[in-house]
Amino acid sequence: MAVRVALHRHVGRAVEVMHLEDQDAVASLCGYRNADALVAALSNAGRSVSWVGDEVWARVASAKTKPVADQLLAPGVILHLGEIHLDETVDPATDPTLLLRVAASAARHKARIDRPTLDRLAQSCPPMPSPWPVGAIDDFVGLLLTAHDAIPVLEALDQRGLWVKVLPEWAPNRSKPQRNAYHRFTVDRHLWEATANAATWADRVARPDLLVLGALFHDIGKGYPGDHTEVGVTMVERIGPRLGLNADDTQMICAMVKHHLLLPDVATRRDLADSATIMMVAEE
C-alpha cells in the first residue's frame, strides 16, 4: 500500500503499474536505499502472499478429498489425501537427505507438501553436509527433471528457509530483481524457470542431469559482486564436488556457466553469415 501511494504521488495520478523509469523515485519516497531494494521487497511480499493463498486453498481442497489408502513414496515419505507427509517415526534432524526425498516425491506426484511437514523440516532438518551423502544428488536431479512441476515445490521450500539448506549460495539471489527488458523474473525465479524449460529437453540429450544443473547454476553469480559469469564459474567449481559430481562433470557445468551468454551475444551483435563468426563460436 505504501508503494502504491508513493507511485501515485510521484506520477501525479492514480496508476497501478510502476514502470522502470519510476522505480528510483518511488524507492526514495518509500525510504529504500535504491530501486533494487524496493523491487526485491515487493517481489518478496508478493510471492509470500501468493504462497499463503495457495496453501489456504489447497487445504480447502484437501478437506474435500475422499479418503484413500496412504501410499509410501520413499523412506519416511507418505502421500496422504493428496499431500506429502512425513512418517511420524522419522527424525529430520538425523537425515539431511530427507528434505530432498520429500521435495522430489512432491514434484513427481504434483502434490503439495503438508504444512506441518514443512514446519518439521524447517525446525529440525540440518543443512546438507559436504560432501552430500551418496544418492542425494539423484533426488536433487530427479526434482529438477520434473520441469515446471518442481517450481511450486521449490517455492514452498524457499518460503520456509529450506532451499538455502540445500544450496546456501542461493541466498543473495533470492527475490533479486533484474531491472532490464530482457528478463521477466527475479534472478531466483529466472533460474527455476530456465531449469524447468531445460528439463523439457531431457530426452534430447545424453546427460539430462548436467543440462538441468547447468541451467540452475548459469546465473548463480548474479547475487555477488563482480562479473556474474566469472563468479558463477568459481562457485560451481566448489559446488560441484560438494554435490558429488566428478571433475569432468563439474567442468562441463563450469563451461555451461562460462559460455551461457555466448550465443545470445553472437545472435544479437554479430553477422551470423560471416565465417569469422562461425569460427569464433567453434573456438570458444
Which residues are covered by each model-predicted region?
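Non-catalytic interface/linker regions that flank or bridge core catalytic/transmembrane domains
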Residues: 1-181
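Long, K/E/R/D-enriched contiguous segments that form extended
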Residues: 135-214, 223-229, 234-235, 258
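Generic helix-packing signal
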Residues: 7, 57, 110, 198, ...
